């Protein structure tokens, strides 16, 4: 966003009202303007807040709270963005460019998608609009499958409130603010190579933003009432088949999977894909059907949110072998496995643990040809590099976000610790919770046929490469300037001297460009890496979307062949607790 300007320009407010096609936001502004003119200080403050910033497109597309005005997500902002995207594509390709457009099940997303389709059509493009809500991986699949030049996903979801509390820390997240998004992917003739079909990165985001800024009055934006093409069940069916094929095989032994769809768009597709490979799927009924009023689930913290509790209860009831949950947009996937050492009998796997077993499976498959690259974000576990090396494959680091991971040349598998996995980059250049769920479940069935389990595989890898245990620390603040100040202190000599009793022997600033693992450098990023003599590591970076400072902690504990891994796991947990305590003291947030 642009820097806030708290002065109130009533002429600009009136002009916005005049061109707003949405009666709800138009009346919202009109009522505030009338109250302002009558001396209502609260209305004046609300108007000033709505018009103090301009929501701008970045590498994440458009993201903002819904509401009226240029600083919120609404139909006016999206129409302008669509016009800018159309101008960008027209400048690159001429007329006839193709854009796939999808939306989620939340209220208002369909209107944003239809406006986008109308603008693309009016600009001489070919708009392909999903006829119903769809999961994000289906949109990313359609972009590559149909050879389109771009794709847009319109969503309205929930995010933590601005009062300093966090939805991910609550069992019920209904108090969260909305956060709408308008995500942009490029492919077809615009982007070639490994980035074809991935989300935008620089310089594309800035080039599109320039054209959005040049859009004048909406009166000059042609918006026909028809002319776009509908995408129906056939594309969804193709994606479902593709997700099933991503497993490379059918279930090898009977396996019962409990599936939690978190009231999002991916439940039916994920259930069908799992069934097609011969798995017995039991869905969590209260979380299965899409709910336009449901708050989003912070799936990357299921153990805190309590959202997995119904699935775990059902798993105990039906004697399941595996629990899988996919995020509301089906981009992320988390899992739980039976474990007698855990209270309740079920162990929730971390994103790094799922990434480890999926990475081992991908490496075994790729080793037959001797080619392929495994990649993960720089904040994720270093275990994947060791797996790749053990199989004679390459490994790459990437900045956080799948827009970077999916651009790795030769990629056969990529993941980030926040429960995102790309298991079939030839089909979907984004995180794909459905394909990951299918591959993980089939792997569990193969292991079951061999008399083993996912837990056994994790233990084997720990003995081969050391137990790599990871845990995050997120510090939320009300004043974002506190995060900048904390990073400045760390860079100015305030780095910890030791972590968990081990001296810090290396400090690396990601602004200098970290190694990609192949002799190259990653783009500069705001973050710091601390390594200790014990080979523990912490990555500290500001969140890109929330007022948080995030710390990604990893410890490595050697495991002798004759030693129980559970002992090493307890040692690692104690060390992670000590590291988090040390970080809290150093950061002072």
What residue ranges belong to the model's regions?
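Conserved phosphate/anionic-ligand binding catalytic regions in large, soluble enzymes, centered on
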Residues: 51-71, 156-157, 177, 261-269, ...
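An N-terminal, well-structured beta->alpha segment
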Residues: 3-4, 13-116, 232-257, 265
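Phosphate-binding and adjacent anionic-ligand microenvironments
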Residues: 170-171, 179, 316, 320-322, ...
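Short acidic, glycine/serine/threonine-rich loops at helix termini
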Residues: 110-115, 140-144, 162-190, 220-223, ...
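Gly/Ser/Thr-enriched, mixed-charge loops and adjacent short helices
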Residues: 16, 20-27, 46-55, 165-309, ...
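N-terminal small/polar loop signature for handling phosphorylated ligands or for N-terminal nucleophile
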Residues: 100-179, 273-335
């Amino acid at each position: 966003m642009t820097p806030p300007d708290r002065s109130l320009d009533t002429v600009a407010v009136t002009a916005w009202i005049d061109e707003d096609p949405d009666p709800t936001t138009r009346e919202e502004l009109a009522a505030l303007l009338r109250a302002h003119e009558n001396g209502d200080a609260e209305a004046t403050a609300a108007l000033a807040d709505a018009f103090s910033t301009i929501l701008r497109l970045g590498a994440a597309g458009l993201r903002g709270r819904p509401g009226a005005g240029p600083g919120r997500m609404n139909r006016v902002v999206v129409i302008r963005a669509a016009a800018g995207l159309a101008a960008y594509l027209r400048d690159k390709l001429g007329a006839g460019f193709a854009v796939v457009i999808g939306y989620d099940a939340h209220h208002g997303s369909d209107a944003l998608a239809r406006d986008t389709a109308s603008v693309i059509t009016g600009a001489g493009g070919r708009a392909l609009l999903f006829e119903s809500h769809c999961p994000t991986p289906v949109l990313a699949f359609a972009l590559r499958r149909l050879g389109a030049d771009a794709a847009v996903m319109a969503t309205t979801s929930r995010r933590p409130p601005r009062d300093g509390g966090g939805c991910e820390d609550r069992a019920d997240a209904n108090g969260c603010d909305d956060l709408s998004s308008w995500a942009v992917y490029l492919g077809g003739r615009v982007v070639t190579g490994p980035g074809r079909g991935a989300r935008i990165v620089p310089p594309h985001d800035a080039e599109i933003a320039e054209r959005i800024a040049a859009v004048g009055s909406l009166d000059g934006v042609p918006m026909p009432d028809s002319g776009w093409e509908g995408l129906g069940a056939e594309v969804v069916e193709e994606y479902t088949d593709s997700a099933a094929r991503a497993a490379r095989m059918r279930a090898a032994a009977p396996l019962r999977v409990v599936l939690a769809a978190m009231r999002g768009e991916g439940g039916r597709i994920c259930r069908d894909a799992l069934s097609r490979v011969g798995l017995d799927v039991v869905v969590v009924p209260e979380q299965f059907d899409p709910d336009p009023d449901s708050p989003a689930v912070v799936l990357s913290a299921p153990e805190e949110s309590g959202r997995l509790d119904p699935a775990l209860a059902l798993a105990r009831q039906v004697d399941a072998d595996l629990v899988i949950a996919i995020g509301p947009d089906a981009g992320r996937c988390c899992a739980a496995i039976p474990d007698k050492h855990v209270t309740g009998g079920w162990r929730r796997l971390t994103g790094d643990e799922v990434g480890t077993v999926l990475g081992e499976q991908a490496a075994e498959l790729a080793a037959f040809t001797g080619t392929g690259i495994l990649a993960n974000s720089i904040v994720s576990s270093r275990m994947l590099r060791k797996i790749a090396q053990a199989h004679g494959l390459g490994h790459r680091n990437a900045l956080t976000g799948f827009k970077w991971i999916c651009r790795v040349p030769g990629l056969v598998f990529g993941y980030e610790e926040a429960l995102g996995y790309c298991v079939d980059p030839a089909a979907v250049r984004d995180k794909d919770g459905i394909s990951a769920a299918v591959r993980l479940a089939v792997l569990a069935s193969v292991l079951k046929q061999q008399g083993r389990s996912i837990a056994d595989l994790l233990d084997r890898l720990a003995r081969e490469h050391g137990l790599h245990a990871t845990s995050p620390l997120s510090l939320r603040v009300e004043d974002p300037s506190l995060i900048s100040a904390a990073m400045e202190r760390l860079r100015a000599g305030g780095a910890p001297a030791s972590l968990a009793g081990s001296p810090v022997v290396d400090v690396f600033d990601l602004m200098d460009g970290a190694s990609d693992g192949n002799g190259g450098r990653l783009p500069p990023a705001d973050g710091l890496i601390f390594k200790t003599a014990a080979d523990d590591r912490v990555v500290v970076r500001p969140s890109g979307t929330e007022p948080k400072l995030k710390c990604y902690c990893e410890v490595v504990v050697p495991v002798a062949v004759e030693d129980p891994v559970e002992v090493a796991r307890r040692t690692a947990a104690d060390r992670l607790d000590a590291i988090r305590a040390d970080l809290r003291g150093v950061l002072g947030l």
